[in-house]
């Protein structure tokens, strides 16, 4: 819970970088509580994405160190986020909301293009389940790799 609070608190300087019409899409969040969402369907995707397994900048986890300036997430989370944004786009009725969602998706996966990691268990199962206590991770250029 401490990690979640640290990750979601964000700095006040980063608050102006929040994606339009959202409370969870950007550095940290500006929601009053877990159920506080902006009007875009994509905000639900961002909230879920914010709670994903991650390796913070400078942190070592699963045998790898994140030397990048930004937090990196598990590739499963990145794939789920991309899929969720596509579904959010399809649910939106207003053209402006569709456009904002598509721009968010294009920015995140096109411009920002985050690297991610895959956790593997010694038994070769994909990590983060109850039976994988000592998972080992490897970096990927994208969840699509």
Swiss-Prot record:
Tissue expression notes: Expressed by the venom gland.
Keyword hit for Calcium: yes
Gene3D superfamilies per UniProt: Phospholipase A2 domain (1.20.90.10)
CC cofactor: Ca(2+)
Disulfide bonds: 25-46, 45-84, 52-77, 75-116, 121-132
Active-site residue numbers: 49
Predominant localisation class: secreted
Free-text comment on the cofactor: Binds 1 Ca(2+) ion.
Residues annotated as binding Ca(2+): 24, 26, 28, 50
Keywords in alphabetical order: Calcium, Cleavage on pair of basic residues, Disulfide bond, Hydrolase, Lipid degradation, Lipid metabolism, Metal-binding, Secreted, Signal, Toxin, Zymogen
Membrane spanning stretches: none
Propeptide stretch(es), residue numbers: 124-128
Recorded catalytic activity of this chain's protein: a 1,2-diacyl-sn-glycero-3-phosphocholine + H2O = a 1-acyl-sn-glycero-3-phosphocholine + a fatty acid + H(+)
A GO BP entry: phospholipid metabolic process
EC number: 3.1.1.4
Protein function: Scorpion venom phospholipase A2 (PLA2) that contains enzymatic activity, but does not inhibit ryanodine receptors in contrary to imperatoxin-1, another heterodimer of P.imperator venom. PLA2 catalyzes the calcium-dependent hydrolysis of the 2-acyl groups in 3-sn-phosphoglycerides.
Annotated family: Belongs to the phospholipase A2 family. Group III subfamily.
The protein's name: Phospholipase A2 phospholipin
């Amino acid at each position: 819970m401490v990690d979640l609070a640290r990750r979601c608190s964000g700095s006040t300087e980063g608050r102006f970088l929040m994606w339009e019409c959202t409370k969870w899409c950007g550095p940290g969040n500006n929601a009053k509580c877990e159920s506080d969402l902006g009007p875009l369907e994509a905000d639900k995707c961002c909230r879920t994405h914010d709670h994903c397994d991650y390796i913070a900048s400078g942190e070592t986890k699963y045998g790898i160190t994140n030397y990048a300036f930004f937090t990196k997430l598990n590739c499963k989370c990145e794939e789920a986020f991309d899929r969720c944004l596509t579904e959010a786009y399809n649910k939106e009725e207003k053209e402006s909301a569709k456009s904002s969602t598509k721009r968010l998706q294009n920015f995140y996966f096109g411009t920002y293009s985050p690297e991610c990691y895959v956790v593997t268990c010694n038994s070769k199962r994909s990590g983060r389940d109850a039976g994988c206590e000592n998972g080992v991770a490897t970096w990927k250029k994208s969840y699509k790799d």
